[in-house]
Amino acid sequence: MTENALPLLSAIEWLPEPSPLLTASLLDWLLEADSMTRRFEAHCQKVTVNLLREAFISPEEIAAEAALLPPEKQYWLREIELCADGIPWLVARTLVPESTLVGPEQKLRQLGSVPLGRYLFASSSLTRDFIDVGQSAGLWARRSRLRLAGKPLLLTELFLPASPLYGSLAKENT
């Protein structure tokens, strides 16, 4: 599913606020202000990261996301699969402007198999500008512009079918 899910990150249809599609249990997951890694850890034994891609990419490769970040010559891209007990629950794409990668934020390029949330939410300088909610191929997604010490990065997360988000929807519908 993961290889097939990566292209879905670029095909997400972002919903207007408010949308009648957004139930209370969906909003509880999609508007989570804390670390999604931490939220997942409450539902499994172990959360791990499978690193799918890390590289500098050009502005042409970020298409619609460019409007949400400052113009740069290149951006650091990190695409991962977040697994719970070995089962993929989420794919994520992080875009970091090159100008963000100075000072302590250089560590964003060296996370490897460390979940982004563990790094971000350990910082006292983390803020979030917004959370957008959307869908792609029937799967739910969210997008956030976060700031570390005022420097932006964009995180897009797509919840895979095994994610507990969908379990909460099933309970809501019974």
UniProtKB/Swiss-Prot annotation:
It comes from the Bacteria. Pathway: Cofactor biosynthesis; ubiquinone biosynthesis. Substrate binds at residues 36, 78, 116, 157. Removes the pyruvyl group from chorismate, with concomitant aromatization of the ring, to provide 4-hydroxybenzoate (4HB) for the ubiquinone pathway. It comes from Erwinia tasmaniensis (strain DSM 17950 / CFBP 7177 / CIP 109463 / NCPPB 4357 / Et1/99). This is Chorismate pyruvate-lyase. Monomer. Its EC number is 4.1.3.40. It is an enzyme of class 4 (lyase). InterPro entries: Chorismate--pyruvate_lyase, Chorismate_lyase_/UTRA_dom_sf. Coiled coil: none annotated. It catalyses: chorismate = 4-hydroxybenzoate + pyruvate. Belongs to the UbiC family. PANTHER family: CHORISMATE PYRUVATE-LYASE. Pfam families: Chor_lyase. The gene is ubiC. Keywords: Cytoplasm, Lyase, Pyruvate, Ubiquinone biosynthesis. GO terms for biological process: pyruvate biosynthetic process; ubiquinone biosynthetic process.
